[in-house]
């Protein structure tokens, strides 16, 4: 099923290699989601991407986000260095792009989980995957069930409520 829905994720790359960073903002900025899942601070995600890039020879970092304008507002450093915002327009495009990353910093959302799973299980070369911990704002027993053994956890830092405007107020 997956191969039929996102065939490019399983084909040889045609674009230059990159590291993927996924930042879920959008509805995570709303009060109803902030206390349950909460947005991870985008500057932390960029820093983790930068560390992966340095570790692996300086490949560019491609940011996948549902809120490019908010991400750029929160991370002005995005205009310098080897960063780019993905032009993926659908969830399938984003999933494909993230799964093709040579290393990947996940967000706490199932789209990220599936991209990391596909990258880890279907790529011939090992893929460094950094997974957020805890997955929810409040740690849960499920946190131990989510990662694959080869994934590395990173300690989440939540985006402060004052850092971004609530999209429903715009």
Where are these regions (language model features)?
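Compositionally biased, intrinsically disordered/low-complexity regions enriched for serine, proline
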Residues: 4, 14, 57, 129-131, ...
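Secretory-pathway luminal glycosyltransferase catalytic domains
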Residues: 1-51, 55-56, 161
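Donor-binding and catalytic core of enzymes assembling or modifying cell-surface/extracellular glycoconjugates
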Residues: 53-139
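Leloir-type glycosyltransferase catalytic cores
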Residues: 137-170
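Glycine-rich loops and low-complexity Gly/Arg-rich segments
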Residues: 44-48, 86-90, 108-111, 154-159
């Amino acid at each position: 099923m997956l191969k039929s829905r996102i065939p490019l994720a399983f084909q040889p790359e045609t674009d230059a290699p990159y590291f993927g960073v996924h930042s879920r903002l959008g509805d995570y900025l709303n009060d109803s989601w902030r206390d349950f899942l909460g947005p991870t601070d985008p500057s932390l995600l960029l820093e983790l991407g930068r560390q992966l890039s340095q570790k692996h020879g300086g490949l560019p970092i491609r940011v996948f986000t549902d809120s490019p304008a908010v991400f750029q507002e929160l991370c002005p450093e995005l205009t310098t260095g080897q960063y780019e915002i993905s032009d993926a327009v659908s969830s399938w495009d984003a999933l494909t792009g993230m799964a093709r990353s040579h290393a990947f910093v996940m967000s706490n959302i199932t789209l990220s989980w599936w991209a990391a799973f596909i990258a880890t299980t279907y790529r011939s070369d090992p893929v460094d995957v950094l997974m957020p911990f805890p997955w929810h704002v409040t740690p849960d027993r499920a946190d131990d069930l989510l990662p694959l053994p080869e994934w590395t956890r990173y300690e989440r830092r939540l985006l402060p409520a004052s850092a971004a405007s609530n999209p429903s107020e715009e």
